[in-house]
A protein has these predicted regions:
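Ankyrin repeat (ANK) tandem alpha-helical domains that serve as protein-protein interaction scaffolds
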Residues: 1-142
């Protein structure tokens, strides 16, 4: 298997652009794509429920582990098991922290990973909105 990637592979500038992309800022997503970091733009979009971006990560990119990360953030048990199996320890901790796992959140705080904590907080907001949006009876199709 090819070398697996991690969010720790990226410098601060790119992670800040990723954070802004998570917030939906198209300028930052375009910046990531223009600078050959389409995988970060796709991950931001996949976390925001873009199924085409998720499909691209999983099947067409060299970053399927980021597609698995998106699924793990959504709580898919097989994705969590995949991250464990392939020893993607940081991505696993990240996904668990995004799911509000106390031990994982404490690990990020203990290691003073402030930027990752900011990203995790943004993903918490996204997941909360997605949960609210899916339970809104006014949005359901019958």
């Amino acid at each position: 298997m090819a070398r697996l990637h991690s969010l720790t592979d990226y410098d601060t500038k790119l992670l800040l652009a990723f954070l802004e992309g998570l917030k939906g800022d198209k300028n930052f997503l375009d910046f990531l794509i223009a600078n050959n970091f389409a995988e970060l733009a796709a991950l931001a979009n996949a976390i925001n429920s873009d199924t085409e971006a998720l499909e691209w990560l999983l099947k067409k990119s060299n970053y399927p582990e980021f597609g698995v990360l998106s699924n793990a953030i959504d709580g898919e048990e097989n994705a969590i098991e995949w991250l464990k199996k392939y020893q993607c320890d940081f991505l696993l901790k990240f996904a668990l922290a995004c799911r509000k796992d106390d031990e994982a959140i404490k690990w990020f705080a203990k290691n003073d990973l402030k930027l990752f904590i900011m990203i995790i907080q943004r993903i918490h907001e996204i997941l909360l909105f997605q949960s609210w949006d899916s339970s809104d009876v006014h949005r359901r199709r019958y």
